[in-house]
């Protein structure tokens, strides 16, 4: 999909770049698969900010995605490819032969009219979902489960994919795009192919207001704050951060400091993303 530039009628239009999506459905989404969702503004139930830089944005309705793909041995036809405001990937509306409809993450190359199916022994074909134990080594997959029947958790964003590199006993070894090598139970399901809309990272919003439409608020440097607001704040004129190491507003080291503490799953990581 090519990028489109605009006539520079304003600074925002001059800098903007959009991905051309001619095959995306222009009408309304399937009403039965929509749910309402309210904005949190990054606040928890106490009203305190727990996630910064969140607030405002256009109203959105959540599209219910079938991450489990547990409707086995029943063929489905792709009715259309749609835009989803809640994720970077596009979604595909499926219609099963029994009349049921559902949304899935749209793989790269999937188009209207294609037939897909899920099950333990289905063909290795784009969009089909099956357990890792039945997928040939070297296959590129996406929407991978971390626990059997829990639903896809890995490789769901635009352009992402995972490669099945080995299978030994009850485990399958996956190579992630980050370079991490990870073991997953071979009973976990995955979908053949990689996620579509792979040029999403090439788009340019063009102006700050476009970011606000997405519900993202500005990020203020700690050095521009007062000492009461941030450890880097204060000082005369444009002073530096003043700390020997950069920290978060709560004093936790940042910019490279490792914060992952999950010994339970560490045993499944063969090689970390940092080598």
Swiss-Prot record:
Highest taxon listed in the record's lineage: Bacteria
Region (Disordered): 227-261
PROSITE patterns referenced in this protein's UniProt entry, alphabetically: RIBOSOMAL_L2 (PS00467)
A Gene Ontology biological process term: cytoplasmic translation
UniProt keyword annotations, A-Z: Ribonucleoprotein, Ribosomal protein, RNA-binding, rRNA-binding
Record SMART domains: Ribosomal_L2 (SM01383), Ribosomal_L2_C (SM01382)
A single GO molecular function term of this UniProt record: rRNA binding
Gene3D superfamilies cross-referenced by the UniProt entry: 2.30.30.30, Nucleic acid-binding proteins, Ribosomal protein L2, domain 3
Keyword Metal-binding: no
UniProt feature coiled coil, ranges: none
GO CC annotation terms, alphabetical: large ribosomal subunit
Keyword rRNA-binding found: yes
Function: One of the primary rRNA binding proteins. Required for association of the 30S and 50S subunits to form the 70S ribosome, for tRNA binding and peptide bond formation. It has been suggested to have peptidyltransferase activity; this is somewhat controversial. Makes several contacts with the 16S rRNA in the 70S ribosome.
Family from the record: Belongs to the universal ribosomal protein uL2 family.
Oligomeric and partner information: Part of the 50S ribosomal subunit. Forms a bridge to the 30S subunit in the 70S ribosome.
Protein name as annotated: Large ribosomal subunit protein uL2
């Amino acid at each position: 999909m090519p990028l489109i530039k605009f006539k520079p009628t304003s600074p925002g239009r001059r800098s903007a770049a959009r991905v051309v999506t001619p095959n995306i459905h222009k009408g309304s989404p399937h009403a039965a698969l929509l749910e309402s969702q309210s904005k949190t503004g990054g606040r928890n139930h106490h009203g305190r900010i727990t996630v910064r830089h969140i607030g405002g944005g256009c109203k959105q309705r959540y599209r219910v995605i079938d991450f489990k793909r547990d409707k086995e041995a029943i063929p489905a036809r792709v009715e259309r490819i749609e835009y989803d405001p809640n994720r970077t990937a596009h979604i595909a509306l499926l219609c099963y032969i029994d009349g049921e409809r559902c949304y899935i993450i749209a793989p790269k190359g999937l188009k209207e009219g294609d037939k897909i199916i899920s099950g333990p022994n289905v063909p290795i074909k784009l969009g089909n979902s099956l357990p890792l134990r039945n997928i040939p080594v070297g296959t590129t997959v996406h929407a991978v489960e971390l626990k059997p029947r829990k639903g896809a958790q890995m490789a769901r964003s635009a352009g992402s994919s995972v490669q099945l590199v080995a299978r030994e006993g009850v485990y399958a070894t996956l190579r992630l795009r980050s370079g991490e090598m990870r073991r997953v139970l071979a009973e976990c399901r995955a979908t053949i192919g990689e996620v579509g809309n792979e040029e999403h990272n090439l788009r340019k919003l063009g102006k700050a207001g476009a970011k606000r439409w997405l519900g993202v608020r500005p990020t203020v440097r700690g050095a521009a704050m007062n000492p009461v607001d941030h450890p880097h704040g204060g000082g005369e004129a444009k002073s530096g951060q003043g700390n020997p190491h950069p920290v978060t507003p709560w004093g936790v080291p940042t910019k490279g400091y490792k914060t992952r503490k999950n010994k339970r799953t560490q045993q499944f990581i063969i090689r970390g993303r940092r080598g």
